[in-house]
Regions:
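Sec-exported extracytoplasmic/periplasmic mature domains
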Residues: 55, 59, 63, 92-95, ...
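Solvent-exposed, polar/charged alpha-helical surfaces in well-ordered, non-transmembrane soluble domains
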Residues: 48, 52, 56-59, 85, ...
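Active-site segments of SGNH/GDSL-like serine hydrolases
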Residues: 102-108, 137-170
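Hydrophobic h-region of N-terminal signal peptides that target proteins for export
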Residues: 10-17
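Sec-dependent signal peptide recognition
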Residues: 2-7
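Catalytic His-Asp segment of secreted/periplasmic serine-dependent ester chemistry enzymes
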Residues: 156-243
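Boundary of Sec targeting at the N-terminus
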Residues: 20-21
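Conserved SGNH/GDSL esterase-like catalytic core that processes O-acyl groups on lipids
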Residues: 26-131
Length: 243
């Protein structure tokens, strides 16, 4: 088991090195913004504050924007909250062209596959099944008319175990976004470069240009504070919507 987890994390770090460096958004990613097309923010508890902050930024620029977030949910326990059904119904109601997603913060746990087998976190089987779920979430969004998905990678985490998990899941995001049917439609966005003095190293505070210490992370070392959410919202909208 330890060897399996180690191999998974090594692969995650290798892949995530590409994703976390975050190349500037390709020009076609910004095309959807040109005609003031509607946007939707979807996610777990990580999206609760971010969604509202992104909405505020977009609405200030004249875009239609809505948010749906579900605290404590994820793709590991679909028996508790069926994200695929929720994505489908929310997409049909909101009819967005651009969708911003964060899912995964709560999924460091065992999951059950379609055959009823319990797959323990840290196994190759877990990684394969979880990757399929990430890919399916992307596909459901695209099948419902979205032209662009902006998938938010997990930020740096305070605890070592959570940081390793974030590295692993970010690598899975990158793998699924690179699938040929998705690669020109799904764009990854690294929160780490905006929330850490050194990407890969957790920090709770950043200094504002005015020299004020800003608390950017929640006390749990996982979620963002309201100030952190505002930082990500501005960076995201600047990158994908603004010239």
């Amino acid at each position: 088991m330890k060897r399996t987890i180690l191999m998974m994390l090594m692969a995650a770090c290798a892949l995530n090195g590409f994703a976390a460096d975050e190349a500037p958004p390709r020009e076609e990613a910004k095309l959807a913004a040109a005609e003031k097309q509607p946007a939707l923010m979807l996610g777990d508890s990580m999206m609760r504050l971010m969604g509202k902050a992104i909405e505020k930024e977009l609405k200030a620029d004249g875009y239609e924007a809505t948010t749906f977030s579900s605290i404590g949910s994820g793709l590991a326990r679909l028996d508790v909250f069926d994200w695929f059904s929720r994505i489908d119904s929310t997409m049909k109601a909101a009819k967005p062209v651009v969708v911003v997603v964060t899912l995964g913060a709560n999924d460091r746990q065992a999951l059950q596959d379609g055959a009823g087998n319990v797959l323990q976190f840290g196994t190759a089987e877990w990684r394969e099944e979880y990757g399929k779920r990430i890919g399916r979430a992307m596909d459901v969004i695209l099948e419902n008319g979205a032209k662009r998905i902006i998938w938010l990678e997990l930020p740096d985490m305070k605890e070592h175990l959570h940081q390793n998990y974030a590295d692993l899941v970010n690598a899975i995001y990158a793998e699924q976004a690179a699938v040929p049917s998705r690669k020109d439609k799904v764009f990854l966005f690294s929160m780490r470069r905006h929330l850490s003095k050194v990407p890969g190293k957790y920090t709770s505070f950043l200094m504002s240009p005015q020299g004020q210490a800003l608390q950017i992370r929640d006390a749990d070392g996982i979620h963002l504070s309201q100030q952190g959410a505002k930082i990500i919202a501005k960076a995201l909208v600047d990158a994908f919507w603004r010239d």
